[in-house]
Every structure is written in C-alpha cells, then in structure tokens.
Amino acid sequence: MKPIVRRGLGLLVIIIFSVIWMLSASMSRKDLRVRTCTGKETLDVIVKDSTERRFVEKEDIENWLEAEYRAYAGLRLDSVDLARIERIILGHSAVKTCQAWLTDDGSLHVELTQREPVLRFNEASNGYYSDADGFIFPLQSRFSVDVPVVEGAIPMSIPRGYKGEPATEQERVWLGQMLALTAHMNGGIWKTNIRHMNVEKSGNIILYPLEGKERFIFGAPVRIPEKFGLMEKYYTAVVPAVDAGKYSCVDLRYRGQLICR
C-alpha cells in the first residue's frame, strides 16, 4: 500500500472516531438533561467511620437536604448542585469530610467521615469537644464519646453551639497544650487511668486517676513528658515504700521533685 494511501486511511480513522466521540458526548449530555434525580427514595449514605462514632446517620442527611436544599427530587441530573449539597452537609459540626455524586439511575450518593473527639470540655451551661486538630464542636445529642473530660476554670470563651478554632491566639495555644497532654496520656500507660482533669482558677491542671485517692497537681500543661515521668516514679518508687493511701496530693510542678502530702 502506498504511503499516501496509508496516511489517508489513518486520517479517515481519526475522523470517524472523533465523530463517534462527539456524538456520544452529545447523547450523554442530552441523557443527563432527560434523566432526573430520584431523591431520598434512593438516597445512598455511606458514613465511613460509623462503627466508631454515630454522630451522623442517613436520617440526618435526609433532613438537612430537605430543610436546606429543598426539592432536589425530580431535578434533571445536570441541574443538581453537588457542590452545594456538600457545603450543606459540611456545615454541620460533626461532619469532617463529604463527597456527593450522582449515578445514571438518578440516585444521589453521599460519602462522609465524622470528626473524632479527643477531649471533652464541660462548663456550667456549655459542653463541647475538640478533635486532635484543635477544632471545637458541640456535644452531639445522639451519641457521646468516651474521652478525657476537662472541667473547672477553662481559659477559653466558647459560645454555645460554636464550631471552629478558638477565637484568640492565647486560647489556641492553651488548647494545643491540652491536646499535647492528652496525646501523651493516650500513647502510654495513662490512657485508661486518667479520664478527668480540673482547671483551677490559678491555671493549675489537676489530674484525677480512676484508681486511688491521689490527685496530681500538674500545673500548666507544659514539660509534659517530664511531669508524667515524675508521676510514674511516684507509683514505682514511693507507693511501694509507704502505707496504702498515705498521700492524697502529689505535686508534679517542680523539676526533678515529687512533693507528696
């Protein structure tokens, strides 16, 4: 076959495939305009971490979309604003990530993950969680998580129902220190024994282990590994050498010293 003929055939093949692709794309766009969203009847919700936390369920997604998106059932597939649906769902404090998409049968699919609390703060008329990133969000009515609880003179001003980072740099620094303290506890032997902390007006953090009557004056949430090292020495060196229950207060604030009373 002559080269010019081969080139002509090659060009013809390219043209044919281009026409087929354009026709297919045109038909696909037309198909999207004809097909409609079936709404909550076929709404598919995947909560990826539902075995760990149950803050959000399918019913919540249905209610949020009904209240904030209004009628999406019956809309042409190319008219459903998926970005808006994701914004609506992400606007709820317990949701961390969200992705929405449609399938050819008209079904809306939503996949999400929930925020993971690591600390709970209890105030007189307010309660809220913080995740490991320092994002604060309200307690959830459906489900509570077993995490360490902080009470007392908490040096943060958090409005009821607030979600987001603390407003001031000073508050963000303090919260970061408390998260570092919690991470240290969760990474070692203290995870199951210390579930309650109290903040005194002086700013001192008091730790209350589940076992024993001792309370530990931690002071400010700084020099964290050093202070937990002192706490461990109390249990390994002091407790075996004295009568059970002799001390009720152990001060960890001073470098290299344990003050027991």
What are the residue ranges of the model-derived segments?
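Charged, solvent-exposed interaction patches on well-folded alpha/beta domains
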Residues: 1-49, 56-60, 65-91, 96-261
